[in-house]
Amino acid sequence: MLKEYRTITEVAGPLMLVQKVEGVKYGELGEIELANGEIRRCKVLEVDGQNALVQLFESSTGINVATSKVRFLGRSIELPVSMDMLGRVFSGMGKPLDGGPNIIPDKRLDINGLPMNPAARNYPSEFIQTGISAIDGLNTLVRGQKLPIFSGSGLPHAQLAAQIARQAKVLGTDSKFAVVFAAVGITFEEADYFISDFKRTGAIDRTVLFINLANDPAIERISTPRMALTAAEYLAFDKGMHVLVIITDITNYAEALREVSAARKEVPGRRGYPGYLYTDLATIYERAGRRIDSEGSITLIPILTMPEDDKTHPIPDLTGYITEGQIILSRELHRKGVTPPIDVLPSLSRLKDKGIGKGKTREDHADTMNQLFAAYARGKEAKELAVILGDAALSDTDKLYAKFADAFEKEYVSQGFNEDRSIEKTLEIGWKLLSILPRSELKRIRDEYLDKYLPKAAEN
């Protein structure tokens, strides 16, 4: 029998103080029963002696401190999990949104999970094909990696996220592949886009969707990424699946964290975010990876919008410390009509060399990647010089590099949001572009690969 308390003494915004409590724990769920019988949910944020500070999941409107009562449920937030989750759409708290029945669970898991023992981690080493040349060819995603996408307000990161979720696959393996997609603090229009896109393309069948709308409570926004990762851990480590987790938008998550922190009157850190923002983000990002004792894996792509396109803002800054690289979207490329507008030069995948080469992608991948980076960087320099001094100031070689840079953006980076390129197609396009330059300029590629692949590219 659950004990009921009629000792609510204060309600301030989303917070409520309950006195004279016994045996209540941090993170415990509770229910508030109003005088009219309505039930609202809450969660314990802090326990000080016999006082418990709880956060409401819903509005505090209508709560009367004299007539309302609280009971604590003795458990934290849990997610019921089973294979039936695939193909379903849930709220940020794990409730079905698609009109289907509740999940009959194999088990119930605490959404906070457990940290993965560093000694039990397996090193990421298998290539994941996203079908996007700028990622597969130059900033390769590896199974078990944490690779964020840094975007800006108004850039098409939603379309890119949907494209990756549709197209991602692990090559050369019989293991099943699943996608867990968590949308945090998005508008109804964006939610409708994601759900419709996954259903239209059939990707919904291998996907678990968690949708948290902008008008949902902040506490739900904080729970949504953890719901997604809990589902991913079940699919990966209990069922042996390769799971790709995409979370958009981490900025909305951090804003919710700041809102809760301000309500608790905590001492703010940089830009008003709580001082524990780094630690809190790490509890999300570090749940990705591979385990020695499991065939499954969790690969994480968190997407965040940089306020004012500022890479030094606390959210992208701290995310960069925890994760293994970043994919950066460019407003300049977006204005040029390049889709997806991935700026390959400042982008980085720190584990890309572990997932490419003979037996994984192709033997010439590393050499062509390095040469494409170098040629594009020099081509951009040549174009900047031409703006200042005019085309006449460029040498014939510089003009070829400028031509290469334009062709690279148009043919390699830009592919639209519906084209799914194989890694062979991506490498073929790379060689075709490199054939614009004289062979003497291709100093980063071994002669054996030049002899083997360059003549074919020149013919195309």
Swiss-Prot record:
InterPro entries: ATP-synt_VA_C, ATPase_a/bsu_AS, ATPase_F1/V1/A1_a/bsu_N, ATPase_F1/V1/A1_a/bsu_nucl-bd, P-loop_NTPase, V-ATPase_su_B/beta. GO terms for biological process: proton motive force-driven plasma membrane ATP synthesis. Pfam families: ATP-synt_ab, ATP-synt_ab_N, ATP-synt_VA_C. The keyword Transferase does not apply. Keywords: ATP synthesis, Hydrogen ion transport, Ion transport, Transport. GO terms for molecular function: ATP binding; proton-transporting ATP synthase activity, rotational mechanism. Belongs to the ATPase alpha/beta chains family. This is V-type ATP synthase beta chain. It comes from Acetivibrio thermocellus (strain ATCC 27405 / DSM 1237 / JCM 9322 / NBRC 103400 / NCIMB 10682 / NRRL B-4536 / VPI 7372) (Clostridium thermocellum).
